[in-house]
C-alpha cells in the first residue's frame, strides 16, 4: 500500500473553522498529530519568510491576512493518494488531488484567501 504524510496548517484567522476541518479531514485521511503552534511576535515575519521561502517583511499582507497569533499544524497520512493536474499559484502542477481539493474547500470555509495551507505533493 502506498501512503504519504502531509501537513495542513490552519493560520490564526482560520481557527474558527479548525474543528470542522479536523472533522472533514477524517473522511479521507488518518490524522496523526495536531499541534497548536505559537511563534513569538518578534520572530513571526522571519519564521513566515523561512516557511514560504520568500522574504516577507514585518506587517506583510500575508501576516495581516493570516494572523500572527497561534495556529494549528495537522499531520495526516493518506493511503493510495491520487495525483492529477491542478492550477496552483505556480501554474499547472501534478498534485495530490484529494488534498489539494480539500485545501480549496477549507479556504472557502475560512472566507477565501490563504488562511489554510497544505503540502500539495511530496516535492
Regions found by a protein language model. Give the residues of each.
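Non-catalytic terminal and connector segments of soluble metabolic enzymes
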Residues: 1-123
